[in-house]
Amino acid sequence: MKKNKILNPKLGVCREYPPVLKEVTVPFSRAISTHHGDSNIPGITPYGFVSEGTPLPPLEKILNTAHVMSVGMRVTFRGVTTRHSTLIRGPYGWGEFAPFPEYDDAEAAHWLSSALEAAYLPPTVTVREQVPVNATLPAVPAHRVPDVLNNYNGDIQELKIKVAERGQTLDDDIARVAAARTALPNARLKIDANAGWTLPQAFTALTALSDYNLLYAEQPVGSINDMKQLRTQLDNAQVPVLIAADELVRKADDPLTVARAHAADLIVVKAAPLGGVRRASAVIAQSGLPAVISSALETSVGIATGVHLAASLPELPYGCGLGTVSLLNTDVSSTPLVAENGRIPVRPAAPEEARLKTLAADHATRTWWLERIKRCWRLLHRGYVTAEARHGHENMGD
């Protein structure tokens, strides 16, 4: 098969990927949707419980083992100063349910599927014992960069820098990236705009920031059309910055649309928003693009799921965004999953009994999260019954 080359001349990066995706026989729609009811079910690969033929665990059982946690942050990250999540225990270990508060139930249900898969289904096969990770630099003032980087253990090989923060300017971003390059002259740098720029702003910013030898820019703009136009503009101007899609994968009705449109050079994949390791693996395989595995500001329990996904992939061309435990004041585990010299070991993570008590959320927060789990479980159960029936019919040739 003829392949397209992804080039970054300044860094000597050459990446190849298939120009045409593998044939998709079933639309990859979101598994749960309050707008489409029972008919909108898993597509290419259903949730792990469907593909494994395993019933969803009973809601009462989930709630009885759920621990709602409240963990402070070292720095403000996406406007968050305290991270709340729910840890769920099952026969195969622990899972973490940590969708951000603003996510609606239809979106949060994917995260519950991922947590339940980690706790109630056997782990998938892995091919490595450790995974490369990047450190993450929030949108802090330039003078704080050295202090934040000191929170990481050992040498930092790759660093993701947050940019396009609301209320900040391009000058702030340039100063932050420059400070990072000064502190880490040999590290691979990449930026994440979280779709915070318009198309003109993104072109201006990436042209300026390319002087710092960026590996790639993650989600600089919000739409697929703007991503395609931005890639074309950068190519025409010979600006050597690759484009990665994140929100266009994890928040899209069809996470493969951005790949089919050739709007990105690589994709950033998080297990939880896609419903778990099994479904996320399918998205990567179908996309035909290099993948970066990332996390969503979770404790070591959630990070372990992302690490497992990364360890199951045959290739990891870039450092994974799985080093965010270092941004927490503490962790639920006494042996947190943090990077040492840019690598994290592949192993399960479990909370320490004492920390389940000391880090427990207050009554109001606990009640809010448990009610959210109930609503999401009902969405999952409704989708599971329909998907399980269709999955069975397809297996019988109907």
Task: Describe every region a protein language model picked out.
Residues 28, 35, 40-190, 194-212, ...:
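N-terminal capping/lid subdomain adjacent to the active-site entrance of alpha/beta enzymes
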Residues 286, 305, 313, 330-344:
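C-terminal helical cap(s) of enzyme catalytic domains, especially alpha/beta-barrels
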Residues 317-324:
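Short helix/strand-capping turn motifs
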Residues 166-308, 330-331:
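Catalytic core of soluble alpha/beta enzymes
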